[in-house]
Amino acid sequence: VTIHDSFKWVLNHYIKQESVAKTFAPLLEKRPEKSPEEWFHFLHEQGLLPVNSETKKEWFHWRKNVNVKELELFIKKMRSIFQGPDTEIFIFPLNRNHGAILEGLDGKNGITFPVFILAFWKATLPERDQKALLLHEYHHASRLFHRGENERSVSLLESMIMEGLAEWEVAKQLGETHMAPWTKNYDRRMLLAWWKDVYQHYVLLQGRHTYKSLLFGGERRIPPLTGYKLGYDIVRTHLSHKEAPEDSLTLLKKAPETFLTGPYKTNEYHN
């Protein structure tokens, strides 16, 4: 597992006067079908702090609070536990003007692709919370690896379980105080109402593009991140009734429907 320090790219931009597109080439080459303009539009949407004269000090301030070697050691330890893939991780400072991420996600955001991970966080994020973000995303990469899933094949239920399991692992490895803020959203009664009225009927949908509004919420009157929180509650409900806790690797390989126990039992898988 390699962590790419984007601060070095920005230094080359300022010192060698290289274009941002050239210095960011190690990432841009991962998806050559995307133009540099498309790439940077996507990165800025996800929270990237822009690279310009006005943000130069912010880039330096962010980098002072990042220990790349320590983060790499941590993720390599997780790779050993998860028997996960050799993934490349690209880390970036978060734009403090990105209110949705600062407020809704506590100043950190991550996206996992099959062979690489993007991670963004605010300059003041403590190291243990940086680890929590990287653990969450690397857990996704490991589950996709073990389950043989991709963007087109992954079901709504699998996506929900992935989110719940990743946060369960964060609590196990780093403590509950470092879990994502959305794990504390919404009570059980509300979640079960959404599950019974809506979600259980769509768990077999495949391809992330087909169920985006269900997973992320915020549309069609669905509260934000309802799919995420349901996934966590399904995982928590299932594992809290286990007499002997299953190890991390066993859980990574476990089929999503086997987590549907207690009030989350459904007939969808038996029709």
What are these regions (language model features)?
Residues V1-W62:
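N-terminal low-structure segments adjacent to metalloprotease catalytic domains
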Residues V51-F113, E127:
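Auxiliary, metal-adjacent structural segments of Zn-dependent hydrolase domains
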Residues K131, E158, M162, G227:
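Hydrophobic (often cysteine-bearing) scaffold residues that line and stabilize catalytic clefts
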